[in-house]
Every structure is written in C-alpha cells, then in structure tokens.
C-alpha cells in the first residue's frame, strides 16, 4: 500500500460544506492482516465492508484519497427505481431468467437503501417523491408506456400527471407537457449517506484507512484470503495486479 498519493482532502463541494462532523480515518502505520480486504471507499466498497463486518468477517477497507472524494460523494443523489433502459431492452440482451434477476435487483435497490438508513439511523436528508418529466408528447407517451409496464410487473407507486396546467402549478413552470410521479423514488444527500455507511461499518468492526492507495496485489498464503476491488483499476499513476481467481 502506498501512502504518498496526491489527495483531495478538501472536498470543495456543496455537500461537504453542509457537514461539520466529517469522519476521519487514519492511514496504517504498520502491516495489516485481515480476512477480507476491500479496495475503494465509495458506496459499493463501503456497503460491502459494512455487510461483511455485520456478518462477522474481519474486514479492512482502504481508500486512496479520503472517503467521499470520488463519485459517491459528489453525485446527484437520485434514489430511483429501475434502470436507464426498459425491461424490453434488458430482455433482448439477456436470457429471460437473467433479465428478470437484473430487473428485480434494480427495483429492490431503493428498499435496501431505505432499510439501511433506518437500521443505522443515517441522517442523509432522504426524501421520497420523484418526477419523470416530458418536454413533448412523444416523451409523455413513453412515460405512459413505462407506467403500464411497471404496473404489470407489480410496481404500483406511479401516477401519470398529464394535465400541463395542473403540473405547472406544482413545479412552477409550464415547460413540460406532463410527468410521471414515483412515490417510491426520491433523493439523498450522498456524502451524508456515505459518511453514515462509514460510521456504521466502523461500529460493526470494519477497519477503515484513508490516504492509502493500493499499487499492487499479490497472492500470498498468509494474508487476506479475499480481496474485493471497488475502484478504478488504475488509480492515478498506480499499477495494479489483479489477484488470480
């Protein structure tokens, strides 16, 4: 592990400016042993570390920069059901059972986030209510088709808003011909959520280290038995050797 990476300790974002109690984690001062090493401190890596620690595993998570310096701490915070493509598109790309699995995973993601926020009491400004808006009639027809498709698959949280004047009264502009309201999608403050995951993972026993870049992975018989890579394969100027499966 390399502790000499150029870092972005000052996150310099509106999300960071809203937070006074940012968690801080050290860089390691000696060699470390663990059962599972997680590389990358974004949503995916931190959730993996939390879940593994909650299930009794000895976990270390290392982050080359500081927690929240990448996309997980800087994104739009949208908490939305489904995928960017509809189920018909997914079904054309995959066998039926795999397409259904992918679809179900996307639809359950919001519920998993909600459960995690409640269980760990994460204050991340989670709010529900989301509008998919249509600028013209063709887009509105696509949204109505989405409404019908999701309803057939058992998702009953969508409401079509196809009265332009009524919609304008809610959102303050008449630029849209209509919208689809999703009562089970919403928004979070992503950096607060990530910090909440980090605190929960640490409380569960995961060891978290910042400013700790991984430059190489070697398979040895007496170190971490598993390594989970949840970051870019080539952070900055580092070289990275993947562990053989």
What do the PLM-derived regions correspond to, one by one?
Residues 218-229:
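Conserved beta-strand-loop-beta-strand element in the redox core of flavoprotein oxidoreductases
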Residues 82-165:
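Dinucleotide-binding Rossmann-like beta1-alpha1 core, especially the glycine-rich loop
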Residues 154-157, 164-180, 184-186:
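Hydrophobic, small-residue-rich alpha-helical packing segments that form membrane-like cores
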Residues 57-74:
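Glycine-rich FAD pyrophosphate-binding loop
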């Amino acid at each position: 592990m390399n502790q000499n990476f150029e870092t972005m300790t000052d996150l310099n974002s509106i999300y960071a400016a809203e937070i006074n109690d940012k968690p801080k984690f050290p860089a390691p001062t000696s060699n470390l042993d663990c059962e599972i090493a997680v590389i990358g401190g974004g949503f995916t890596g931190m959730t993996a570390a939390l879940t593994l620690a909650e299930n009794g595993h000895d976990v270390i998570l290392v982050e080359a920069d500081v927690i929240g310096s990448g996309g997980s701490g800087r994104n739009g915070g949208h908490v939305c059901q489904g995928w960017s493509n509809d189920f018909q598109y997914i079904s054309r790309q995959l066998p039926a059972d795999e397409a259904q699995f992918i679809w179900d995973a996307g639809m359950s993601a919001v519920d998993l986030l909600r459960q995690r926020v409640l269980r760990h009491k994460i204050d991340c400004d989670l709010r529900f209510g989301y509008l998919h808006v249509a600028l013209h009639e063709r887009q509105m027809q696509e949204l109505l088709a989405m409404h019908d498709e999701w309803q057939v698959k058992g998702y009953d949280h969508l409401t079509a808003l196809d009265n332009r004047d009524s919609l304008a009264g809610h959102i303050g502009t008449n630029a849209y011909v209509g919208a689809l309201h999703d009562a089970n999608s919403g928004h979070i403050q992503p950096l607060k959520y990530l910090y909440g995951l980090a605190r929960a993972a640490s409380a569960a026993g995961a060891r978290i280290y910042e400013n700790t870049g991984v430059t190489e992975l070697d398979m040895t018989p007496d170190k971490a038995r598993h390594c989970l890579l949840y970051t870019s394969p080539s952070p900055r100027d580092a070289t990275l050797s993947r562990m053989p499966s």
